Amino acid sequence: MSQIIGHISQVIGPVVDVYFEGKGIDTDLLLPSIHDALTIKRNDGRILVVEVQQHIGEDTVRTVAMDSTDGLQRGMEVIPTGHPITMPVGNQIKGRLMNVVGEAVDGMRPLSKEGAFPIHREPPKFDELSTVQEVLFTGIKVIDLLEPYSKGGKIGLFGGAGVGKTVLIMELINNIAKKHNGFSVFAGVGERTREGNDLLREMIESGVIRYGEEFKKSMEEGHWDLSKVDYNEVEKSQATLVYGQMNEPPGARSSIALSGLTVAESFRDRKNGDSNGPRDILFFIDNIFRFTQAGSEVSALLGRMPSAVGYQPTLATEMGQMQERITSTKNGSITSVQAVYVPADDLTDPAPATTFTHLDATTVLSRKITELGIYPAVDPLESTSRILDPLIVGQEHYDVAQRVKQILQRNKELQDIISILGMDELSDEDRQTVNRARRVQRFLSQPFAVAEQFTGVPGVMVSIEDTIKGFKMILDGEVDYLPEQAFLNVGTIEEAIEKGKKLLDAASHKK
């Protein structure tokens, strides 16, 4: 059976109906399948890709556009591709920036679609999955100690607007590239173009993406000269970026997470003969809420009845189809870190609540902690991890983590008494608990490499051994003599002791 050429019959915003003439007469002619890509040539020569979402009757399909529909007219020719949207694969995509349909948007040479992977794929079969439990240490104290990340797991970064989700993601990419020599795929889903631009520049400056020394030098001088890019160096990069910004139509924003995931799968599932490829991939999604939001827009445009709070009725299904593909197989692993915007800081909203069910670890960023000036603003009592288990992380790590949580919880309970009666009314034991809890709270902060240009403090990565040692010393009262300020924005306990001694010296000189 053969494919047929269609024509646009209706355009309503990003929704395009395509009529296939003669389909009702000649039964040998097939309508394009659901999720197939169709192409429309605009008057200026550019190609628009649309994706089939519904069959209407026997001769019309309803599609959603992956780019602006400005300039489309009824009667324009539509060519079926016979397959879903595909993403390019191989070393050629290392260090590159792509859009939802796999086109390079970084101004460099075009990418080959040979051997391309379709973005709509089945998840790995049950017998292909790996069940090995392994901790992925990030060099960030609060994460490694209290909510350790699992290699091949799914991690959610929850927080409202402006609490530091994107900065934490950028630091994780930076640390994992340096510490584990890991390969990252970053999917920018419906976020700001400025943030995408900042991330690309940050990655070039830190060496995660390599454009060559000549280009880097010209960039430092304030020029963006792509003629100086060394393509041999680009293929040594440790990241690939896939962007669908917030100015894109909802079709692109709802599919961009799948496009990024397909790139991550292509590296994980490389053939055994291909030894160049990374097998353990880090997949970052910023922001998974925008994936849900775009799905809601598409659902409304297609005329589906909304469910709770106006979200699409297929919310759980769409989320499940994507999350089931993010997993470890016997070939390699995909560890995903997903930033989750929480509307109005309400964790019971259907979008974050649906995401929660799929996660192995949650890192909750809190506005109350940003108000204390503690960054990363991770809430140690709200954040959780499935693998904080003595059989996986070891007994000492588990015991210290539990003691930290207990002292912070007790401090939280005492805050009401302190706010009404003051510290003087507490027993000696409770006063000691509060003082140590305040030191623990400050020691959970850490300077980030990606924030160095704002803070002027060089970023640090702290090993899990140093982290456990530091918190144990605070809990055991070995550093009670140091001022609280000594523990803020330092890496190891040795740095805190050194800073504390300087503060004590400065205070004694003032007297």
From Swiss-Prot:
User: An example Gene Ontology cellular component term from the record?
Assistant: plasma membrane
Matching entries from SMART domains are given as: AAA
Q: Main localization of the protein? A: membrane
Q: Which UniProt keywords apply?
A: ATP synthesis, ATP-binding, Cell inner membrane, Cell membrane, CF(1), Hydrogen ion transport, Ion transport, Membrane, Nucleotide-binding, Translocase, Transport
What EC class is this? Answer: translocase
Transmembrane regions listed in the UniProt entry:
none
User: Family, per the entry?
Assistant: Belongs to the ATPase alpha/beta chains family.
Can you say what this protein is called? ATP synthase subunit beta
